[in-house]
A protein has these predicted regions:
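FAD-binding core/adjacent interface of flavoenzyme oxidoreductases
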Residues: 1-10, 31, 38, 45, ...
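Beta1-alpha1 glycine-rich phosphate/pyrophosphate-binding loop at the start
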Residues: 5-74
Length: 144
């Protein structure tokens, strides 16, 4: 069977990249499918990350790049395309994109999350400069 992997990971945020690293450490064939222009997921929109052990004050873009580089160093394979259909009710799962059809014994969905914008005036322009979407993440930036 062509394009058969032990694991296909859909999403390349921190969870997807962690799954890719662990799959390679376990000597599994894997493919990570990402729809976005860069790996990292929602963290890419974060100005400064202060709660990731060992990398205090790293930007979200740099953290995403660091996680991607780690996965690549382990031998992770990536494809930039959007998944349009999943067939998960058979032993060999099918993942279809616009361009390709892949097969896997296991599919990991790590599609992440996205904050919900309020769409109020100034929200976009002030995001990261007073407008925040995570009180737990950003609360320390606003303490007196």
């Amino acid at each position: 069977m062509e394009n058969l992997y032990d694991v296909i990971i859909i999403g390349s945020g921190p969870a997807g990249l962690s799954a890719a690293i662990y799959a390679k450490r376990a000597k599994l064939s894997s493919l990570t499918i990402e729809a976005n222009f860069a790996s990292g997921g929602q963290v890419l929109n974060t100005y400064e990350v202060d709660n990731y052990p060992g990398l205090p004050g790293i930007s979200g873009m740099d953290l995403g790049s660091t996680l991607r580089a780690h996965a690549e160093k382990m031998g992770a394979e990536f494809s930039r395309e959007r998944v349009k259909e999943l067939v998960l009710d058979e032993e060999i799962k099918i993942v279809r994109t616009r361009k390709n059809e892949y097969h896997a014994r296991t599919v990991i969905l790590a599609t992440g999350a996205e904050h919900r914008a309020l769409n109020v005036p100034g929200e976009k322009e002030l995001s990261g400069m007073g407008v925040s979407y995570c009180a737990t993440c950003d609360g320390a930036f606003f303490k007196a």
